[in-house]
């Protein structure tokens, strides 16, 4: 099996090392793991692509590259340059430091990397490690993802959950903020929404008198819709969410047509 991995935390992020371990276990001794990841942190860039300026790329070692672009850029660089036409059997993006559940899905560069792979017709999974009070004292905050990651990915692969015609389908996996031994299992869950944790800004003043703003996110431990991804994560379960690139609110089409069509 040939596996391509990327992330949004950058080529030197500890979560990428976790993903490399997961990918190597899945690929087996006769497989290949290729890494093309951002040279610098790209958290929050979503599905951005760098089509207005060139993207520098450097080979760091065997099958290991750093690109000065987004996770989606990295997937494109791998498919159309690094791999020289060889198609990966699977694309994994992560393991993100922090959850990409609920509304975080819309901002996530980790999810954006998996989305680009799906648009290219490839099986893809985004993986993230939810952090919280129970992970703060761990020597390895990625313990849950490191221990259970390969098993969860293999579960999806063995069930043949990709339809060759549905090129936009991919999966979003979030590991709960608990030690590996405390994992309660996995749940298939819809994307949720934390109503009280939208982003805001914090105004500050520089020593030279210039005003600047920091983007501020809300608390990740806040309640969300029962049974959805963030909710089951906080209950100690891995969440597995099927996603598509199609953002159409299909349930509203007929109503809108009746009102204004």
UniProtKB/Swiss-Prot annotation:
InterPro entries linked: SurE (IPR030048), SurE-like_Pase/nucleotidase (IPR002828), SurE-like_sf (IPR036523)
Entry function: Nucleotidase that shows phosphatase activity on nucleoside 5'-monophosphates.
Entry's EC annotation: 3.1.3.5
The protein's name: 5'-nucleotidase SurE
Keyword Metal-binding: yes
Protein family (similarity comment): Belongs to the SurE nucleotidase family.
Catalytic activity: a ribonucleoside 5'-phosphate + H2O = a ribonucleoside + phosphate
Keywords, alphabetical: Cytoplasm, Hydrolase, Metal-binding, Nucleotide-binding
Record flagged with keyword Manganese: no
Organism: Cereibacter sphaeroides (strain KD131 / KCTC 12085) (Rhodobacter sphaeroides)
Broad class of the protein's primary localization: cytoplasm
GO molecular function per UniProt: 3'-nucleotidase activity; 5'-nucleotidase activity; exopolyphosphatase activity; metal ion binding; nucleotide binding
Origin: domain of life: Bacteria
Binding-site positions, a divalent metal cation: 8-9, 43, 96
Gene assigned in the entry: surE
A Pfam family hit: SurE
Cell compartments where the protein resides: Cytoplasm
Cofactors: a divalent metal cation
Any one GO cellular component localisation term in the record: cytoplasm
Primary enzyme class: hydrolase
NCBIfam families: PRK00346.1-4, PRK13931.1, surE
Cofactor: how bound: Binds 1 divalent metal cation per subunit.
SUPFAM superfamilies tied to this protein: SurE-like
